[in-house]
């Protein structure tokens, strides 16, 4: 399976498991609460589509990078991400850091800065991971979808793309049928992703 097929099957198998988990934990109410809000404020659907795009492109990039030899660039974005989140917290939410936290941030800046210097450039994958997630989390907080229900909608709204990638774009369904152990791998991926 290539990165697009793996992404598709991950999305298709994660949603049922996360739905079961939310049902078991009593969190499905968040899904229906957001649905009621969409009925009252149809413009919220646009935000949910943007949220789904930001979230699922991150999930896709996480799979695409290593498969396509860009794992280091994607990983560097994940190392840079907490620093951007600290910056967002301090600037937008006026959070204060303790002396130990400032020391930790300074050491992280040194480590990540050294790696960027060693590589000699900042790839688009690094920038996307480091900036898109903070935007995603900020907007989810602003639109009050920062719960499992919001994530459920992110996955639900990407289903048409996942179905296309899994059933039209590729012949992966034939691969899954011919190698039945892959079905268990896909289900395991969905289960682990839902956790």
Cite the ranges covered by each PLM segment:
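Structural motif at transmembrane-helix junctions in multi-pass transporters
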Residues: 2-5, 60-77, 148
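Transmembrane alpha-helices of multi-pass small-molecule transport proteins
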Residues: 3-54, 132, 153-169
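Hydrophobic/aromatic residues within transmembrane alpha-helices
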Residues: 6, 10, 65-66, 91-93, ...
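Hydrophobic/small/kink-forming positions within alpha-helical transmembrane segments
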Residues: 19, 52-60, 82-87, 134, ...
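C-terminal transmembrane-helix exit sites in multi-pass transporters
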Residues: 80-100
